[in-house]
Amino acid sequence: MKKIFFAIAISLLLINSYAQQKVCVAFYNQENLFDTINDPNKNDEEFLPEGKYKWNSERYYAKLNNMAKVISALNPDFLGMCEIESIHSLTDLISTNALITSNYQPVFFEGPDERGIDNALIFKKAMVKEARGKIFTINPEGLGGDKTRGILFANITLNNNEHIYFLVNHFPSRREGEKESEPKRLYVASVVKHICDSLYKKDAKANIIIMGDFNDYPNNASIKEVIGATGDVKAMPTNGFFNPMYNLMEQGKGSYRHKGEWNFLDQIMLSHNLVDCKTKVCYKTNSADVFKQEWMLETEEKYKGNPLRTFGGMKFLNGYSDHLPVMLYLDIK
């Protein structure tokens, strides 16, 4: 009798393990993943073989392999990215030796950004039944006439027939100054919110993941007030979002280091349904984190501990990115 009971218990455990998958969702700023080909419609002159950064094939493939090394170690099932110039650089990335066996599929659209850098989503083909996407371009009138990255939208149908809606973002930078440039980020955040409200109107239980480099922190107005993302699950409005990076920020962690201080420009936010865990897709509590390995960091004393980037000024450092990836896990039944 004991042997029979033990066999049944093992069988139930096996069934349960097959019925539920632990899925990694991540975002990673690729820091200027330009190809070496001149595009007359883009301001890519600095990243050409004869350009400012002497962006030749050797440096390009070193960059691809370095980024692939990070992605392979992270091993995401869904990865949002920004600062990708073209579908060529994206397909070259997922075709590297480190990533080819993962069979990543891309969602990518060329946008109106003046530098020609765009957002992307890649996913493991084995996870997905169907993927559809589009780009929401940002009206330049809301940005004082500037053109910026569009919002990448992907409607992913999982093998269990659940839908996840991804919004991949790269908000306007703080180059003009934090306060001076804030209205631009507030405007783009309002577009994100409008898209999400439209999804909620169609389905109050929509599974929505907002991710990106927001050039703002979790406690800035664009995130906290406009998008309505909070670090307190209990304080979430029905059409709001849970931002696990808020709590990580309070622990002193971060994806980007500025003047010795870590903070989160890169964030992943989840709709109410993903944290309520009442459906087949559920956020794994406290699973959000920054992916950081020693080999991804500077060792030179002056910059020790900073993300090891591709260039330090004009010097080719043969690094990865000036940002670290952010990640979390979902349980999918």
Residue spans of the language-model regions?
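Metal-dependent phosphoester-hydrolase catalytic domains
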Residues: 198-208, 216-333
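N-terminal, active-site-proximal structural segment of metallo-dependent hydrolase catalytic domains
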Residues: 18-103, 107-111, 117, 296, ...
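Bacterial Sec-dependent N-terminal signal peptides
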Residues: 1-22
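Structured beta-strand-rich core segments of catalytic domains in phosphoester-bond hydrolases
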Residues: 84-163, 167-172
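Active-site beta-strand/loop signature of hydrolases that rely on acidic residues for catalysis
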Residues: 28-30, 67-90, 122, 166, ...
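Extracytoplasmic/secreted cell-surface and envelope-processing proteins
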Residues: 35, 88-91, 115-118, 175-178, ...
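Metal-dependent phosphoester/phosphodiester hydrolase catalytic core
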Residues: 159-190, 194
